[in-house]
């Protein structure tokens, strides 16, 4: 699949780390570092603009290493970039740790996964089909 991209950043285009990677790392595009304080959130520019084909979205997800090592996540995870959005991709990061986190220019801050999606149509009914699970949720299967 080809995706049109404008790269106004100082960095190379995102790429897959391996042949089986689902996501591409996205880098911060900053004129100066950002200090993200504990429990603070900020919008981090990437300098990337894309045009996805109809029927696709780009999901912005946290990087697992930043999450476990530094407590840094994507606040609206996954963030969705719709196929008709043409603005700059910016990432909402949140610091869930107890220490300041410095975001440097070029740092890999999130990953992007391109995914197909469908539009759904609502079909109003009076009763839903029964299933074995039923209304069970939020830990209904217990600890095993």
From Swiss-Prot:
GO MF terms, alphabetically ordered: dUTP diphosphatase activity; magnesium ion binding
Needed cofactors: Mg(2+)
Keyword Iron attached: no
Database matches in Pfam families: dUTPase
Enzyme Commission code(s) on record: 3.6.1.23
Catalytic reaction equation(s): dUTP + H2O = dUMP + diphosphate + H(+)
Keywords from the named record: Hydrolase, Magnesium, Metal-binding, Nucleotide metabolism
Pathway, per record: Pyrimidine metabolism; dUMP biosynthesis; dUMP from dCTP (dUTP route): step 2/2
Keyword Protein biosynthesis assigned: no
InterPro entries: dUTPase, dUTPase-like, dUTPase-like_sf, dUTPase_trimeric
Protein's GO biological process: dUMP biosynthetic process; dUTP catabolic process
Stored NCBIfam families: dut, PRK00601.1
Function recorded in the entry: This enzyme is involved in nucleotide metabolism: it produces dUMP, the immediate precursor of thymidine nucleotides and it decreases the intracellular concentration of dUTP so that uracil cannot be incorporated into DNA.
Family classification: Belongs to the dUTPase family.
HAMAP family: dUTPase_bact (MF_00116)
Annotated protein name in UniProt: Deoxyuridine 5'-triphosphate nucleotidohydrolase
Organism encoding this protein: Phocaeicola vulgatus (strain ATCC 8482 / DSM 1447 / JCM 5826 / CCUG 4940 / NBRC 14291 / NCTC 11154) (Bacteroides vulgatus)
